[in-house]
Amino acid sequence: MTAAAADELHTIIDLIRYGTSRFNEAGLTFGHSYDNALDEATQLVLHSLHLPHDLGPAYGQARLLRAEKERVLALFQRRVDERVPAAYLTGEAWFAGLSFKSDARALVPRSPIAELIEAGFEPWLGGREVTRALDLCTGSGCIAIAMGHYNPHWDVDGVDISDDALALAAENKARLHADNVSLLKSDLFTGLAGRQYDLIVTNPPYVTNDETDALPQEYSYEPELGLRAGDDGLDLVLKILRDAPQHLSEDGLLICEVGESEQHLIKLLPEVDFAWVEFKVGQMGIFAVECRELIAHSARITELASAR
């Protein structure tokens, strides 16, 4: 951004407004933690100034030093020129009310599952007791760590195939003192022999090949391993549905995010009673399904999964 801009902009609000305008003008893509230019510009300004993310509006008229303005504008410039997701620029993403370290070793935390965690997974758990929970495809560890944070009596496993993702998850575990969370390397369930859980939560890769190839530049900074999942986005989901009953208690529950691949799943398995979760903003491609329901339809699920 130009030196002239630094001369004309004076306050926190000035910079937030300017960043919002530039981001919209540049046609940036949002969706990594924030879904609009205003919130993302606010995040970048507050981070640059070492201010809390929930800073009150009374500080909006605070005037800035020239060096502070230049630091903010440099971050804006990178966001526009390089299309780097804001969370990777700041190294931080908020999920379920918690601050996570975020970098290119794993997807930016953004799953709507955060809303379920904060609601105690009700009404889907129906008051049933949980002592052991699994976050399959844990990535940054955000789901596992948030589950452990809000449920200190649970023992939570976070599992991923990526060494890079697990290293980031370990840093987040230490950052948030998640002592009841264990991190394990496994290709889905293959390394979890003998482990059973009352609740399995998973946000696996579910983006179709065509969608992955057409994603905006912002997504190119994320590991493709966490996105691409075959022609219909269900290559991993079907394997999870097949194998989950071996690792769920008799009264266990699976919660899975499939995003835009929801319709593909419904067409493949119309007989399965998937309970599609309604969020504050509507359905987001996340379902809950009982262990006994997966067992009842295991033959068809196994047939589909084996064809992948």
From Swiss-Prot:
InterPro entries named among the record's database cross-references: DNA_methylase_N6_adenine_CS (IPR002052), HemK-like (IPR004556), Ribosome_uL3_MTase (IPR017127), SAM-dependent_MTases_sf (IPR029063), Small_mtfrase_dom (IPR007848)
Domain of life: Bacteria
Molecular-function annotations in GO: nucleic acid binding; protein-glutamine N-methyltransferase activity
Free-text function comment from the UniProt entry: Methylates large ribosomal subunit protein uL3 on a specific glutamine residue.
EC number annotated for this UniProt entry: 2.1.1.298
Family, as annotated: Belongs to the protein N5-glutamine methyltransferase family. PrmB subfamily.
Record's GO cellular component terms: cytosol
GO biological processes: methylation
Protein name according to UniProt: Ribosomal protein uL3 glutamine methyltransferase
Species, as recorded: Xanthomonas campestris pv. campestris (strain ATCC 33913 / DSM 3586 / NCPPB 528 / LMG 568 / P 25)
Catalytic reaction equation(s): L-glutaminyl-[ribosomal protein uL3] + S-adenosyl-L-methionine = N(5)-methyl-L-glutaminyl-[ribosomal protein uL3] + S-adenosyl-L-homocysteine + H(+)
Lineage: Bacteria, Pseudomonadati, Pseudomonadota, Gammaproteobacteria, Lysobacterales
Enzyme class (EC, first level): transferase
